[in-house]
Regions:
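Cytoplasmic helix-loop-helix junction between adjacent transmembrane helices
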Residues: 124-162, 351
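Helix-loop-helix hairpin linking two adjacent transmembrane segments in secondary transporters
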Residues: 160-210
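C-terminal transmembrane helical hairpin of 12-TM major facilitator-type secondary transporters
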Residues: 276-280, 286, 293-345
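Helix-to-loop junctions at the C-terminal end of transmembrane segments
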Residues: 80-92, 284-295, 382
Length: 424
């Protein structure tokens, strides 16, 4: 086995980008289409917490029933991510995005029609989770990695993440208005029609045949997986991303009900979720830009530590609309700001040939955290009548994520030719 000091070398000769002869999409086309897709996909899902109260009241379900479906959704998203990423790396992003768009629409329709907890888990959980794996960051970032130069890659990923954040800001008040105007069932059906728009937009990300497979000297899928999971930095990156998922999905799904339990108007929760999306536009763009200039591990550690600090302050000040809005703004800056530097580290260290798949594995860890955050929130609320324990778990995990990101190494791997390895 080649020593670590020989495998880790400075980036030389563009190993992380497609060869110059490979057909490439223009950066503006990739960013506009990718941003529009992420805006729709992430915008729709960000408002799911608004459905908790009307669905559970109308169906007579507990919060744990709704929370479990959302937990399954996040877990299914994560589990399907490596597979959809592998398909996108092999066959190009368009086919995966089109399939994800149709599945998203079907899941929203069946979510509206589900009358049992099992059916709701299958539609809102399993179907929509798989759909999200094919319409969000892993697939879009794979296209960015293959068609944007390394010198601007982190920035471009920040732009795409900022678009997803804008979708959250845009769609939350829209979804709240749809529920108030048409009822929760019809609102879900209208969102299903909106999800179908992803397919025509995805035509702009249809990649030339060679671009999807010629990133560098060919490496098999199994070899790429073994290499990544054998790297300590990849393991630490996954551990930190687990915490990200736990924190943001717990807050996104349960904060509206937390605020309602404390006597605040529903409009406060809607405003808070919208503010998270608005300020996350700034946060994700800034994180992508800073990741181009500073060590990404320090950026990630700082984000996780600041999240824990923000939660501690929020829990220890009087709960008023103003304190909620300030907390939402601060958390918004930190919300998905982990996404660009995390994916940029994967691309920087392992190259872009299997970027969607490896990004999918990292995101799987995120979604396991999401599963636990959203489910545990409902479970502990039903058993204790309070979210307090889960809030403090989120604080402790943030401190842990701060620590595990510090030793991550960002130096690209350079793979020696097979003949050179055999001679050692």
């Amino acid at each position: 086995m080649m020593p670590e000091r020989l495998r880790r070398m400075h980036y030389i000769g563009g190993m992380s980008s497609p060869p110059a002869s490979s057909p490439r999409l223009s950066m503006s086309r990739v960013l506009w289409c990718g941003a529009a897709i992420v805006t729709l996909s992430m915008g729709i899902r960000h408002g799911f917490g608004l459905w908790l109260a009307p669905i559970t009241m109308d169906r007579g379900w507990t919060r744990e029933t709704f929370s479990f479906a959302m937990a399954v959704q996040n877990l299914a998203w994560g589990l399907a991510g490596p597979l959809t990423g592998m398909l996108a790396d092999r066959w190009g992003a368009f086919r995966v995005l089109a399939a994800g768009s149709g599945l998203y629409a079907l899941g929203l329709l069946l979510m509206a029609l589900s009358t049992t907890g099992l059916a709701f888990t299958g539609s809102a959980g399993l179907l929509i989770g798989i759909a999200q794996s094919g319409t969000t960051y892993a697939v879009v970032y794979g296209v960015i990695g293959r068609h944007v130069d390394p010198a601007r890659r982190s920035w471009a990923m920040g732009v795409a993440a900022a678009a997803g954040s804008f979708g959250q800001f845009l769609m939350v008040p829209v979804e709240n208005w749809l529920i108030a105007s048409f009822g929760w069932q019809q609102a879900l059906m209208l969102l299903g029609a909106l999800a179908l728009l992803i397919t025509p937009i995805a035509l702009g990300l249809r990649e030339p045949a060679r671009a999807a497979t010629s990133s560098q000297a060919h490496q098999s899928v199994l070899s790429a997986v073994r290499e990544a999971f054998g790297e300590r930095s990849f393991q630490l990156l996954m551990a930190g991303y687990f915490v990200c998922g736990f924190q943001v999905v717990f807050i996104g799904v349960h904060m509206p009900s937390y605020l309602k339990d404390h006597g605040l108007a529903p409009e406060v929760a809607t405003g808070a979720l919208a503010l998270i999306g608005l300020f996350n536009v700034v946060g994700t763009y800034t994180a992508g830009s800073l990741g181009q200039r500073f060590p990404k591990r320090y950026l990630l550690s700082g984000i996780y530590l600041l999240r824990s600090l923000a939660i501690v302050i929020f829990l220890n000040v009087p709960l008023t609309p103003m304190s909620v809005y300030v907390f939402a703004a601060v958390m918004g800056v930190l919300w998905l700001s982990t996404v660009p530097p995390t994916n940029a580290v994967v691309a920087q260290v392992f190259g872009v040939q299997h970027l969607s798949m490896l990004g999918g594995f990292v995101f799987l860890s995120h979604q396991v955290g999401s599963f636990l955050g959203v489910w545990l929130g409902g479970r502990l609320y039903d058993s204790t009548g309070s979210y307090d324990i889960v809030w403090w778990i989120a604080v402790a995990l943030g401190v842990l994520a701060f620590a595990v990101n510090l030793p991550i190494r960002e130096t690209p791997l350079v793979r020696a030719p097979a003949g050179a390895l055999a001679a050692r």
